[in-house]
């Protein structure tokens, strides 16, 4: 098991979002072990953060957000056969962004994670915003104002023959997405106290 997190560079005249760091986690000891190492520095978009790491079909897939949660927000994918080799960034640019679509109803898309269903369908949940526009302002800059703040969106995800992920309908995403097929609701039983009076020793 591994923990991935953003590595912050405190040095002057260096971009603070240095890259994504990985540290091994021991489930038996319930603690991190060994020394951390940087596995991915992102692209020249910078602001590389929000990592999610998956082991799928012989690859380690790393999903990261870039650009910050603003209109330049985007999600990129990278992969490697080993955590100790260089990660290859998915060719063709970010697989989710609305930076190039100022009139799209979904904006600021990025920063998400994978979901797979029992029937083998794949989805990608992500942050987004739905801006409202003022008639006296440009619809390009600013693109509008998002009174609901950071919202959660979901997109259907497909894998190409080379094993790279793509958003169904294109990298801008869709406003409406078909629900998964044959998925039954799963109700989780609470596994923690509903109330805690914080009167214990710890």
How would you label these PLM feature ranges?
Residues 1-202:
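Carbohydrate-active catalytic/glycan-binding domains of CAZyme proteins
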């Amino acid at each position: 098991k591994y923990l991935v997190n953003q590595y912050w560079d405190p040095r002057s005249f260096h971009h603070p979002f240095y890259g994504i760091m990985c540290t091994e986690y021991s489930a038996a000891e319930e603690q991190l072990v060994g020394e951390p190492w940087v596995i991915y520095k992102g692209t020249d978009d910078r602001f590389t953060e929000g990592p999610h790491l998956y082991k799928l079909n012989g690859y380690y897939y790393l999903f990261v957000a870039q650009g910050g949660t603003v209109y330049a927000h985007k999600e990129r994918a990278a992969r490697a056969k080993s955590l100790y080799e260089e990660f290859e960034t998915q060719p063709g640019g970010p697989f989710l962004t609305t930076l190039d679509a100022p009139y799209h109803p979904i904006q600021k898309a990025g920063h998400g994670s994978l979901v797979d269903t029992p029937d083998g369908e794949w989805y990608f949940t992500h942050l987004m915003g739905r801006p409202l526009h003022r008639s006296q302002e440009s619809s390009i800059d600013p693109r509008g104002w998002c009174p609901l703040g950071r919202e959660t969106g979901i997109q259907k995800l497909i894998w190409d023959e080379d094993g790279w992920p793509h958003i169904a309908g294109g990298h801008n995403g869709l406003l409406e997405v078909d629900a998964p097929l044959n998925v039954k609701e799963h109700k989780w039983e609470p596994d923690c106290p509903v109330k805690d009076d914080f009167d214990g020793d710890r």
